[in-house]
């Protein structure tokens, strides 16, 4: 039977909504990957009595309590003292931890204060969990088959402690080997879930879907007697998803679509440029987040004004006047012009209405046109985001542009596009046909 867990986030600022709780999401996924069933997520304020009552109740529900937050030096940082008491433990001063704190303050040009000594208190019967990235050590307590692990609330410190210390500790307690891999899949969650539903019901390996903007992750986890067997099980199960989804599965174990785009461009000796209007450089930013992007990406044009579109990437002002700046012909000329100006093999373009104002009956807010040029052709697509959320519209547009770039880098035709020859980019009949076809979608 698998271990059960509860994630407990401590901090009044979380209850007030002043801080977004990203720790709970991260830990839920990490625990699931270890085969540990998360029964509940809870948020508790900085109050000793309420926290103690909650801990004693949670011990009856789960094998493992995972805490984040409340390990600081101030009077309202109560997690360590409270959990220690609930687990029948006490705390003692650790000179080594104190010296680390003193050294940290010295490096940053500050002086310690008496309340900083609080962070150097560690369990007597349990053990400390070393924090290599901050001043607050974590803690591990055990009593009557129940465990509690305490980690800092600062996300980067918590993640580092989890990866370096807590995850290996939990793995060592498992009586089997676990292996996970993550498939990155283009498309929405509801359609994907419908297509792969039978594969989500198997107990081992398990598969879970996590929704992102314009794509999903499928995390596959296998439990076996040894790591080799677990890897083999994961690989075989992943093949079932590939068989169902085809090239909608674009990669495995990558941070995002931009990473795959950059790697594919590098593998094929290709370069890319961008011409962005409503996304304002988001595509370029995502590409340059990837190490090694400088080998494939040299030019990014942010052409917010109509004059910029004409001056930087050669859009014909007459085309803007006839078809509107948010149109398929403009997206086509932006992509072709960016490729030419940058000397790039591939270029993507975006022009759209992110709102909240500016829309009309023909082009409501959420209307976006995208172009992707390679060689003597440009592929143009219309995207409509029905929810009038500026951030979402821009994010979806950037994601779609990267998807189109990936398909061109793979030598494929981007789905849902209309093609225009480079030689026809100034042909009134061809531009009108392109405009009418995509406006009708």
Q: What feature does the model see in each segment?
A:
Residues 5-7, 148, 272:
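Conserved hydrophobic helix-helix packing surfaces used for dimerization/oligomerization
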Residues 28, 32-57, 93-134, 308-345:
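Glycine-rich oxoanion-binding loops at beta->alpha junctions
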Residues 50-53, 77-173:
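Proline/glycine-rich low-complexity loops and linkers
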Residues 2-41, 228-232:
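Glycine-rich phosphate/diphosphate-binding loop of Rossmann-like nucleotide-binding domains
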Residues 142-214, 219-221, 229-234:
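Accessory alpha-helical/coil subdomains and C-terminal extensions
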Residues 229-441:
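Short alpha-helical segments enriched in small residues
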């Amino acid at each position: 039977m698998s271990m059960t867990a509860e994630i407990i986030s401590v901090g009044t600022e979380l209850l007030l909504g002043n801080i977004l709780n990203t720790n709970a999401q991260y830990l839920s996924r990490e625990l699931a990957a270890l085969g540990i069933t998360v029964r509940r997520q809870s948020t508790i304020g900085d109050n000793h009595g309420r926290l103690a009552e909650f801990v004693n109740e949670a011990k009856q529900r789960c094998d493992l309590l995972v805490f984040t937050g409340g390990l600081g030096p101030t009077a309202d940082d109560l997690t360590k003292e409270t959990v220690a008491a609930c687990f029948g433990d006490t705390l003692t001063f650790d000179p080594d931890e104190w010296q680390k704190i003193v050294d940290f303050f010295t490096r940053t040009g500050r002086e310690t204060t008496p309340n900083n000594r609080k962070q150097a208190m560690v369990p007597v019967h349990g053990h400390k969990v070393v924090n290599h990235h901050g001043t607050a050590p974590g803690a591990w307590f055990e009593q009557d088959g129940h465990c509690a692990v305490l980690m800092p609330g600062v996300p980067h410190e918590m993640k580092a402690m989890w990866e370096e210390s807590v995850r290996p500790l939990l793995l060592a307690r498992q009586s089997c080997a676990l292996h996970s891999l993550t498939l990155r899949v283009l498309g929405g969650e509801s359609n994907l879930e419908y297509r792969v539903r039978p594969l989500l019901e198997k107990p081992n390996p398990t598969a879970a879907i996590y929704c992102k903007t314009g794509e999903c992750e499928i995390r596959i986890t296998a439990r076996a007697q040894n790591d080799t067997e677990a890897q083999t099980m994961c690989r075989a199960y992943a093949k079932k998803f590939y068989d169902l989804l085809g090239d909608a599965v674009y990669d495995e174990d990558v941070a995002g679509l931009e990473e795959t785009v950059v790697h594919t461009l590098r593998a094929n000796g290709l370069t890319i440029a961008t011409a962005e209007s409503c996304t304002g450089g988001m595509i370029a930013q995502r590409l340059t987040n990837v190490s090694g992007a400088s080998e494939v990406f040299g030019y990014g044009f942010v052409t917010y004004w109509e004059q910029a579109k004409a001056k930087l990437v050669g859009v014909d002002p007459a085309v803007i006047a006839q078809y509107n700046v948010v149109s398929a012909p403009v997206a086509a000329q932006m992509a072709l012009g960016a490729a030419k100006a940058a000397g790039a093999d591939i270029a993507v373009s975006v022009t759209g209405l992110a709102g909240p104002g500016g829309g009309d009956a023909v082009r409501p807010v959420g209307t976006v046109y995208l172009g992707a040029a390679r060689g003597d052709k440009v592929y143009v697509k219309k995207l409509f985001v029905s929810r009038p959320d500026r951030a979402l519209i821009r994010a979806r547009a950037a994601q779609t542009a990267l998807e189109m770039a990936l398909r061109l880098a793979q030598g494929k035709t981007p789905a849902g596009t209309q093609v225009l020859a480079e030689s026809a980019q100034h042909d009134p009949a061809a531009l009108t046909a392109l405009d009418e076809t995509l406006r009708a979608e």
